[in-house]
Amino acid sequence: MHLIAGGSSLRTVLVTGPGGAGRTTTAAATALAAARQGRRVLLLTSDRGPAPEAVLGVALPAPPVGDGSPAPWGPPVEVAPGLRAARIAVGEHFRDRARELQDRGASLFDLLGATPLDAEELTELPGAEPLAILTALRAAHTGDAPWDLLVVDMPPAPGTIRLLALPEQLRRYLRRLLPPERQAARALRPMLAQLAGVPMPAQRLYETAERWEAELAAVQRVIEARSTTVRLVVDPGPVAAEAVRVARAGLALQSCRIDTLVTNRLFPEAPGAAGDPGGTAGSWLAGLVDEQRTALKALREEFLVDAVTVCELPHLGRGPRGTGDLDELAGRARSTAVGGTGIVEGDGLTDELDGWTGPDADGYGSAEEPEAWSVEDRIAVDGVLVWRLPLPGAHREGLDLVRRGDELIVGVGPFRRVLPLPSALRRCTVSGAALRDGALCVRFTPDPGLWPRSS
């Protein structure tokens, strides 16, 4: 694993949604619309299929062999003035990191009598794609980036949520398996190695753990930055709408901010069928439109009430191909948001690229963000402290809650997160929990044996 240190503030939009919702098209249209407004934009895609090249109308080459670049993507290609696009090179990234790991562990291989793998034997393992995407996110924020906006075409929502949770999870594993306090004994390693007559690998192990910890912390800062948001794409319908709700709850569990819900491939209001007015095809299409509009209405209400912009993209009657179709898509996009006077019309796909239209209108990073996961002191009233965890989209039957020492393990559908308890709550016992108004409210009762007594 190799993530890049250093960093800069760069507006970053991660585009995801259920499989087949149109993530790649939405990411490309967003990036092009932003470039048309004068921004310098880099569009990265993790899709290794033909869709990105078909949508953009350009070829995305792989990185040259052995170019030594720390950025895990191929040479960025100009799509339009101000917009460059590149494909994240998952396979090449894995082989580079595997060769690096073998080089670092050469002495251990010699000790064990093992033969390192040749370059052509190194085929990527499960988990290679998330690590390549995380490395790409970090690399794009390194130094003085020559662009104003980074748009990333991410994997489907479940994979994206697990990917965004990975740095925190891996850091926790490192701290548990290789506690920093045990590193004090490293001074004894050379003496132990002489007594044993063989090299002791623990020194290198701890050095590697320290490097990984720093690199994972760096990419976690990118994910948690105020300038990084998620854009959810959905093709409205009953099944897809429920998948978006699950994704929304999973993103909230990871403290990821959603800037826009993009409802894609919307049919016209009047669905007349050419050559079959009022016939079988017209009735079938009318039913499909009604189903889509019902799902759209419910999603609009759910997201707008939480001040999330909703952007509607029309169905072009064909699969978008090239910048002409992307320009048409962006030009016909309609967005609505919650403003100071209620629901207001927006600017389509470029809403939320410079700042929030809601409470944080001063822009990303300039406004004070209230602590979302707040602890409410209700000891004087109810004898409890209440930890409020916003989880919009969560269902009561899909929640799971386990107290383990100084941690709270929260499950929302297929997603889980281990949360360290605030110091005050560590001296309490969990006395109940309830899901109210899109937030999980966990009640803690002070433990008399641990809680400080008033004099």
Where are these regions (language model features)?
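Phosphate-binding P-loop
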Residues: 3-10
